[in-house]
Amino acid sequence: CVAPDRFSHGETMINNDVLRSIRYMLDLSDNKVIELISLPDPAYSIDKAQLDGFLKKEDEEGFVQCRDVVLAHFLDGLVLHCRGRNENLPPRPVEKRVNNNVVLKKLRVAFELKDVDMHQVFSEAGFPISKPEMSALFRQPGHKNFRLCGDQLLRNFLKGLTLRVRGA
């Protein structure tokens, strides 16, 4: 039985929260974030003023909603930064839509997390999940066992990953 608050029905954590959380987790400078965003496609870039708007809280003056394309470039840049670029393969197209499942998948790839690592990350955040729950998150959207990753699940994953990375 799946607790109703563990999986969402369409709700997605705002991109700005994800960007801020990963930036804090890895202690990235503004310049490094900008560099990661342009890493998958040097023709795509943002400037410091845009990043400042993305990093503000929703209720702060100057807040700018981080679009899916920006977060997708950032996550792909993070994967390339952590894993390197495979010159034998053509570049992967950047995701057009980013939801919590995509964020989870990109972070899993970037940090080379196996199932056991994923379970540890969730447990370290005080939010253990079962094997069937986890496998449902990584299924294709049309699959009968696919589940959307809810905000609570993603927040706890980011919290656990931050504890692991920062050693806090």
Locations of the language-model features?
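Intrinsic disorder/low-complexity detector
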Residues: E11, H73-N100, A168
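Amphipathic alpha-helical interaction surfaces
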Residues: K57, E61, G77-G84, L113, ...
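Short, Lys/Arg-enriched N-terminal segments with co-localized hydrophobic residues
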Residues: C1-T12
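Surface-exposed interaction/gating patches
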Residues: I22-D27, V98-I129, E133, P141-K144
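A cross-kingdom feature marking solvent-exposed beta-strand/loop segments within repeated
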Residues: M13-R20, S29-C66, P91, F127-G150
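Short, Lys/Arg-rich amphipathic alpha-helical interaction segments
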Residues: F146-A168
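Membrane-targeting and insertion segments and their boundary/processing signals
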Residues: F7, S45-K48, F74, L78, ...
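Short, structured motif recognition centered on aromatic/hydrophobic residues
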Residues: V18-R23, V33-I37, D68-H81, V103-R108, ...
